[in-house]
Amino acid sequence: MSNKIKYNLKNVHAAIMTHTEDGGYSYETPVPIPGAVNLSLDAEGDTSPFYADGIVYFRAVSNNGYSGDLEIALVPDWFREKILKEVKDNNGVLIESNTDIEPVYFALLFEFDGDKKSIRHVMYNCSVSSRPTVEGKTKEESIEPGTETLSLKADAREDGLIKARTGSDTVDKTYQDWYKSVYVPEVTAEAQG
């Protein structure tokens, strides 16, 4: 049975992506990013109409992925080291410097609760487009936890793959193994045309 609603972002994970020698992709094992508060990713792309005979004769549509923000309680140290490329010194202090670095690409996995079953997602080719802001405020009469926000870009991989999500017909093993490894679709001869 299909969900009617979704709510409650949870189980955010990231898995670093690498290019393989044969031109493919591989992913490390997904690692949790605890403390998810909010995820907002806007679709990017264009439609370009071509007019002929007094009508829209053809319309080209492009899918340029997504961009937006992931708000979490705190960016984990492992994420700062492996993806933001901060360096831990001999005293265990994370150091950020202005050296030019290539962005680290990763898959972002997450889910929303549904009224029947959680909906699991994977964005295949993400990068951080800006470092988290450093901010805080004084404690007043009550403690209000602060959050940190990562600005993300989710582009298509070179093979065109952008994202996948589970649905009501998802095979149970695929659903249960979602966070064990990054799900990559199986392409059948029928699907290739």
Residue ranges and their predicted role:
Residues I5, G23-Y25, P103, V122, ...:
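Intrinsically disordered, low-complexity segments enriched in small/polar residues
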Residues E28-I33, R120-C126, K163-S168:
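Short amphipathic beta-strand/extended segments with alternating polar/hydrophobic composition
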Residues V128-G193:
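Mixed-charge, glycine-accented linear interaction segment located at domain edges/termini
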Residues F58-Y124:
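Structured, beta-strand-rich domain cores
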Residues S2-R80, V128-T147:
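Solvent-exposed edge beta-strands and adjacent loop segments
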Residues T20, D89, R157:
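Acidic surface patches and DE-rich sequence motifs
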Residues A15-I16, L108, Q192:
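Intrinsic disorder/low-complexity segments
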Residues K4-K6, K10, K82-K88, K116-K117, ...:
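Context-gated lysine
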